[in-house]
């Protein structure tokens, strides 16, 4: 009777019990799970047969559903409310969150080969700009990333801690050409910043603000793979991925360096076009500045020949250097080195003439001392000249008076005698005497 019951309850579908035994028909000392080996083999064969039938038979309403086996169902995505973009083009809060990717666990467990895109990631058609997102891939990037550690906060608590809530994050466009990669990577970096992942982006020195977590690296790899197909990547990006296909951080770092290089190129071109030199700075410094700019541009693929460089340099010359624009402008084969030889010659001549000129500039204190000493030395000379000038300015009558008085004095000198003979002598001849020359 026991065998009949076992045959009647033999398994007919996957997941059903192999034997059905009631407690009344089993001895008290017998284990209810104890089944003979032959019966066990029959159960296994029946189970294998049921599985083969289930895989080969297409799904229909006639096939009974197994209540003991629940296949994983994708999480339902709420439709966007008042969103400017269609639902298949948006990344909602239940998408793109690294913390929701529990089935990946680690970047090494990513179920995709390097840059082999699954058909589910291709755009639905040429009319759609962005690919459709499956509901099982990604959760929203609007949740803030932790500053440190590898644990992520719950979405409910993360929403309360957000400073600026963005329910929908617009994904970057698809890369369609290697030449568009510099512009595309800018939009991709902006996409990461809007997703609160700006801390993992390399800075100017090439290092991120914080360390990237495994879940964030997984998200970074998958989003880069989705929007940047391998056939449209530049050669230098493919070289990096050939070494490590998950090293997206190195690609971002190199891209930022190239952006800075492009900015430096633009600044160098503007500086070279607006050169000014009048000899106020050393000629060596001016030459070093110009040659460094030309070398950087040539190394970055912007070739500046000697003719263009000389024209730009001579256009900025002024002062005594201005005549170089007219004396050498017809020399088509002139090089930058020859032009700087002329600039150095003029600069050295200027410096030599400045050094040879005497310097008459004095301190104000020295000028005050010199003025005081000059007045002291000239004062006695003025005093010495004044008496002489007054003596010489005496009238002739006064001098004649002195001479007459000196003649009356008993002591006379030769000067007074010679002067007295010139004057007439009047004699009073009271006795009418006539003197004869012979008598005396």
UniProtKB/Swiss-Prot annotation:
Cytoplasm as UniProt keyword: yes
Induction notes from the record: Ty1-DR4 is a highly expressed element. Induced under amino acid starvation conditions by GCN4.
Superkingdom to which the source organism belongs: Eukaryota
Comp. bias intervals (Low complexity): 153-165, 402-418
MF-aspect GO terms: RNA binding
Residue ranges of the region described as RNA-binding: 299-401
Transmembrane region(s): none
Keyword terms, alphabetized: Cytoplasm, Phosphoprotein, RNA-binding, Transposable element
Entry's free-text remark on domains: The C-terminal RNA-binding region of CA is sufficient for all its nucleocapsid-like chaperone activities.
Composition bias, Polar residues: 1-23, 48-60, 127-152, 419-428
Record site: Cleavage: 401-402
Subcellular location(s) of the protein: Cytoplasm
Ranges annotated as biased composition (Basic and acidic residues): 429-440
Principal location listed in the UniProt entry: cytoplasm
Record GO biological process: viral translational frameshifting
One Pfam family hit: TYA
SUBUNIT field: Homotrimer.
Chain segments carrying region Disordered: 1-93, 126-174, 352-440
Modified residues (Phosphoserine): 416
UniProt protein name: Transposon Ty1-DR4 Gag polyprotein
Coiled-coil zones: none
Note: Retrotransposons are mobile genetic entities that are able to replicate via an RNA intermediate and a reverse transcription step. In contrast to retroviruses, retrotransposons are non-infectious, lack an envelope and remain intracellular. Ty1 retrotransposons belong to the copia elements (pseudoviridae).
Gene source species: Saccharomyces cerevisiae (strain ATCC 204508 / S288c) (Baker's yeast)
Disulfide bridge map: none
